[in-house]
């Protein structure tokens, strides 16, 4: 099993898909890494040679990508700083509402959580 950036990649997936299991690497970055490492995108993770694994590791290190824990920490610190300066976005984060301008009158249930029951009109 290939281990890159501290993550075990799934053996049965193509390497271009397997790399996206690392937090901070999406499709485009995975393709760039493989192109620079000289590895085909169609190779399965289980079929990688140790030389190919080393080339991928070296390329990921060389690109200076923030991955996994560092990236998660950076995102949470950015959100925390928005909340501390009481910006509009920070307030929306604190209240658990959509941050990017979506309407909340009818939708936004994912962000707001389950609907709270309101007592109906008595007959």
From Swiss-Prot:
Described purpose of this protein according to its UniProt entry: Located at the top of the head of the 30S subunit, it contacts several helices of the 16S rRNA. In the 70S ribosome it contacts the 23S rRNA (bridge B1a) and protein L5 of the 50S subunit (bridge B1b), connecting the 2 subunits; these bridges are implicated in subunit movement. Contacts the tRNAs in the A and P-sites.
Subunit note: Part of the 30S ribosomal subunit. Forms a loose heterodimer with protein S19. Forms two bridges to the 50S subunit in the 70S ribosome.
Gene: rpsM
Any GO BP: translation
Positions of region (Disordered): 93-123
HAMAP family linked to this entry: Ribosomal_uS13
Amino acid composition bias (Basic residues), ranges on this chain: 108-123
SUPFAM superfamilies membership: S13-like H2TH domain
Keyword vocabulary terms for this entry: Ribonucleoprotein, Ribosomal protein, RNA-binding, rRNA-binding, tRNA-binding
Family to which this protein belongs: Belongs to the universal ribosomal protein uS13 family.
MF term (GO), any: structural constituent of ribosome
Pfam families: Ribosomal_S13
Signal peptide limits: none
Stated name of the protein: Small ribosomal subunit protein uS13
Gene Ontology CC entries for this record: cytosol; small ribosomal subunit
């Amino acid at each position: 099993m290939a281990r890159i950036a501290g993550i075990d990649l799934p053996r049965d997936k193509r390497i271009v898909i397997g790399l996206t299991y690392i937090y901070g690497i999406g499709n485009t970055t995975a393709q760039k890494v493989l192109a620079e490492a000289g590895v085909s995108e169609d190779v399965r993770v289980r079929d990688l040679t140790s030389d190919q694994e080393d080339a991928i590791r070296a390329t990921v290190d060389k690109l200076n990508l923030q991955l996994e824990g560092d990236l998660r920490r950076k995102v949470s610190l950015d959100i925390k700083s928005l909340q501390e300066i009481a910006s509009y976005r920070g307030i929306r984060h604190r209240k658990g509402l959509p941050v990017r301008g979506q309407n909340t009158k009818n939708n936004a249930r994912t962000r707001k959580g389950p609907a709270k029951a309101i007592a109906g009109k008595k007959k």
